[in-house]
């Protein structure tokens, strides 16, 4: 999909760059694969804001996407590629030979009519899913499981991918787009190819209202708040904060490491994504 830039006939169109979605399905999603979705407004079960800058936005239906890909050795055909308001990637409707339908993340370089399959050892072509044990080294993958059978958790956003770079005991080594090198079990599933919609990051929404349609509210800087609201708040006139940048809860921000050093998953990370900053 290409990008569309607009002639500024209105102020909101000046600088506007959007994704051309003309080739996507224009109808409604499959009803049996959708659920209702209520707005949380960034609040948890106690009603407190746990995620700032959330609220409002257009109504959505949740599309049930198959991240597990455990329907082995049953071939499916991509019937259509659809827009999904709940994620940056596009989704593909797959119709299997036994009549079942499912949504999967649409990979790049796939089109309507392409065949996909999940198997212990499948062809290396975009959309096919298999465990790392049946995959050749060097394959570009997305929708990667961290625990066998849990469903894909890594490389699911638009344009993302990881590379399968080696085997180590019962583990597969993968290099993520952040630069991190980590291990996952060889039984974990992954889908061949990169995720669709790589131009997502090149969009320019042109006006604040488009972000509001997405349910994103304005970001207020801590330095313009009162002392009760933020560690950077207060002071007479404009002040520059007076301390190292911190979050509203006093944790260092702007690059300081705050990850717990005793996390169990640390032993599976061979090379940190921050290693290149340290000159390693």
Swiss-Prot record:
This is Large ribosomal subunit protein uL2. PROSITE patterns: RIBOSOMAL_L2. Residues 254-280 have a biased composition (Basic residues). Keywords: Ribonucleoprotein, Ribosomal protein, RNA-binding, rRNA-binding. One of its GO terms (molecular function) is rRNA binding. It comes from Dinoroseobacter shibae (strain DSM 16493 / NCIMB 14021 / DFL 12). Residues 223-280 are annotated as: Disordered. One of the primary rRNA binding proteins. Required for association of the 30S and 50S subunits to form the 70S ribosome, for tRNA binding and peptide bond formation. It has been suggested to have peptidyltransferase activity; this is somewhat controversial. Makes several contacts with the 16S rRNA in the 70S ribosome. HAMAP family: Ribosomal_uL2_B.
């Amino acid at each position: 999909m290409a990008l569309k830039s607009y002639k500024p006939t209105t102020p909101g169109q000046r600088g506007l760059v959007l994704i051309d979605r003309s080739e996507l399905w224009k109808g409604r999603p499959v009803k049996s694969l959708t659920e209702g979705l209520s707005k949380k407004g960034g609040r948890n079960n106690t009603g407190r804001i746990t995620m700032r800058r959330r609220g409002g936005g257009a109504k959505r239906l949740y599309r049930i996407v198959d991240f597990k890909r455990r329907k082995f050795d049953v071939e499916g055909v991509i019937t259509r590629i659809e827009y999904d308001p709940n994620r940056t990637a596009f989704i593909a409707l797959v119709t299997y030979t036994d009549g079942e339908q499912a949504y999967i993340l649409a990979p790049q370089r796939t089109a309507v009519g392409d065949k996909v399959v999940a198997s212990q050892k499948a062809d290396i072509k975009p959309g096919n899913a298999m465990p790392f044990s049946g995959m050749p080294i060097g394959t570009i993958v997305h929708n990667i499981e961290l625990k066998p059978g849990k469903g894909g958790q890594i490389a699911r956003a638009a344009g993302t991918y990881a590379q399968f770079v080696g085997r180590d005991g019962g583990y597969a080594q993968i290099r993520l787009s952040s630069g991190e090198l980590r291990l996952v079990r060889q039984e974990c599933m992954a889908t061949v190819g990169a995720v669709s919609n790589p131009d997502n990051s090149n969009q320019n929404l042109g006006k604040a209202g488009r972000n509001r349609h997405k349910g994103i509210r304005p970001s207020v800087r801590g330095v313009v708040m009162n002392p009760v609201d933020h560690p950077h708040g207060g002071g007479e006139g404009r002040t520059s904060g007076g301390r190292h940048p911190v979050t509203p809860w006093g944790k260092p921000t702007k690059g300081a490491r705050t990850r717990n050093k005793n996390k169990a998953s640390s032993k599976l990370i061979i090379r940190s994504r921050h290693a290149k900053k340290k000159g390693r």
